[in-house]
Amino acid sequence: MLAASLIWGIVVILCCCFWFILGIRRRRPGEPPVENGLLPYLGCALQFGANPLEFLKARQKKYGHIFTCKVAGKYVHFLTDPFSYHSVMRQGRHLDWKKFHFAASAKAFGHGSIDPRDGNTTENMHQTFIRTLQGNALNSLIEAMTENLQYVMLQSSTSKLHSNNWVTDGLYAFCCRVMFESGFLTLFGTEFNSTQDKNLSQRETQRALILNALENFKEFDKIFPALVAGVPIHVFKSAHNAREKLAEALFHENLRKRNNISELVTLRMFLNDTLSTFDDKEKAKTHLAVLWASQANTIPATFWSLFYLIRSPEAMKAATEEVQKTLGNAGEKIDLDGKCISLNRKQLDNMPVLDSIIKEAMRLSSASMTVRVAKEDFTLHLDNDSYNIRKDDIVALYPQLLHFDPDIYADPLTFKYDRYLDENGEEKTIFYRNGHKLRYYYMPFGSGIAKCPGRLFAVHEIKQFLTLVLSYFEIELLDSNVPCPSLDQSRAGLGILQPTNDIHFKYRLKCL
C-alpha cells in the first residue's frame, strides 16, 4: 500500500515537472511580458472569464500596455493602448483575422470548415455579406424589416392589444420575441406571398413555428460560449437537439417553399449549391450561422437601448420629439388601420438622437474582442516600441477597456443619451484621450477589414424598433427606480452582453 502511494506520488511529481518544463512559455528577448497561469492548458482562462475587464485592468497596471496571457492553450497578446490599435490594423500581412472566426463557426454550428483554403468551398463569405447587407441591398432589408416589425408588434399578437388595458411583460422577453420573429421573416422569408394572404390560421401557424424556433435558438445560444471554447456539443443533449431542429428548418428544400427570402439567403443558397461540397445538413448549418449572427447581438442591443431609453426621462423626451419630427417630415401618419409607417434609409440615418442612444447603450454593454492570429513569427511595430510575436499566437484588442476609460468618457458607467451628440445636436465623431485625438473610440462591431458587415442593418433595425415602439405604444417600467441589471460575463468576447435578469414593464396601444 505504501509502495503504491509512493509510486503515485512520484508520477504526480513527474507530471508536474513535465508540465513545468514543456507547458510553460518562457519569455524571449523582445517579447511582451508573459503570464502562464497556474492551471495546465487553461492558464488564465478561469480568471479572465470571471471578469475580463477587471482581469485586463489588473494586468495592464502590472505589465504595461501589452502583455501575454495563456488562455485555454493559446497565447494571447492583449494590446490595451488605443493609440496603438492602428498598428495592428496596418500589419495585416502578418495577421489572419479569418482563421479564428472560421474555426469558431465550425465548432459552434457543426458544419465543415468554411475556409476556402481547406477545400470545402470557394465562397468568400465576407464579400457575400458585404454585397447583401450594405449598399442597395440594405434598402430592401430596411423596407422588409419595417413591414415585419409592424406586423409582429400590431397583428401577430392582437388579442393582447385589443383592449385599452396595460399588458405586463419582461422587457428582454418582449425584445427577444419581436426582434427574432421580425428578423427571421426578413431574412428567411414568409409562408405567404404577401400581407394580403395572411388569414388567421396561417398567421397562427407561422407564428407558432417561429416561436418554437426561438425556444430552440435560446437553448442553443445558452451554451454558445462553451462551444466556441471547444467543448463538444454532445455534452449538452438538449442544446444539441435544439441546434439540429433549427438546422432542419433551414434545409434548402424547406427554404425554397418560402416567399420573400432576402438577397443574402438567396445568394448563400446559390453559392452553397454551386461552390461548395457540403451536404444538405452542412449547408443548412451555414444558414444557421447567419441566423445566429443576425440575432445573438441584435436582441440584447435592442434590450439595452430600450431599457436605457425608458429609464431616462430626458432621453424619452428627446427621442419622442425626434421620431415625431421625422415622421412629420416624411408625411407619415400614425394610425391602426393596417397602413404601415415607412421610413427609408436616408430618413433613418437623419435621426442622431436615436443613433446616440443606441451607441451609448452598446458602449455600456459591448464586450467584443478583436482577434488576429499570427501567420508567422514577426515583429509588431507600435508607435514607440516593437515586440516579437510567435507564429499562431493571438493578438487581441478588448474594446471594453476603451469604452470604460474615464480619460475618454467622463463618468463612463453612467448612461448619457447625448454622449454621441455635438453642440449642434449632430453626430459627435471627435474624442480625445489625454489631449490627443483618438482614431478608435467606439468599437462594438470590431475594426478594420474584419468589421461586422451587418452592422448597418443591425443599427437600422434597432432604430426602426425604437421608432415604432415610441409611435404606437405607451410604455413604462413597473418600477421606475429598478436598478440596472448586471452584464452576463459568460459571453465576454462574443459581442453585446445579455442582462443577468429581465426587467418587468407594461405597455398598451396609444389612443390615436
What label would you give each PLM region?
Residues A315, L438, M443, R455-A492:
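Cytochrome P450 heme-binding "Cys pocket" and the immediately downstream C-terminal segment
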Residues L2-G112:
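N-terminal membrane-proximal hinge/A-helix region immediately C-terminal to the signal-anchor transmembrane segment
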Residues L397-Y432:
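Conserved cytochrome P450 K-helix/beta-meander segment immediately N-terminal to the heme-binding cysteine loop
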Residues R268-G328, A361, A396, G454, ...:
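Central I-helix of cytochrome P450 enzymes
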Residues N139-T302:
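Cytochrome P450 heme-thiolate monooxygenase catalytic core
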Residues M1-A4, I13-F18, E474, A492-L512:
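C-terminal helix/juxtamembrane-tail motif
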Residues F20-G30, F55, F78-P82, A106-L149, ...:
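Cytochrome P450
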Residues A45-K57, K333-S386, K391-A396, L402, ...:
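Conserved cytochrome P450 K-helix E-x-x-R motif and the immediately C-terminal K′/meander segment
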